């Protein structure tokens, strides 16, 4: 069972996701968008378009409202990207159960973890291929 040891700091990055989980379908819609952004971040990076990312994260925070900030949105998205990368590095024996246990340890809400898990296994070969090409 190759669990991924995710850093404790992700719990702080995922605080916004806990708030979104409590918002029901609207919160899940934001989470799905965050997952798409994390996917893009893994495959193309974020540094090249940092100014665009900053505006996008700020706009998302405005739509979410409450205590959401551009920094909290950025932290959540990049935290999700970190999860995707670390799980891809875990290898082919990494299972859905391993994914769920690994993400539970850093406080990712169960419904969001299940969605991210399905997304990960749908795109795992893309992530592994990208890592192989970029991390020689």
Kindly give the residue locations of the regions a language model identified:
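Positively charged, low-complexity terminal tracts
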Residues: 1-136
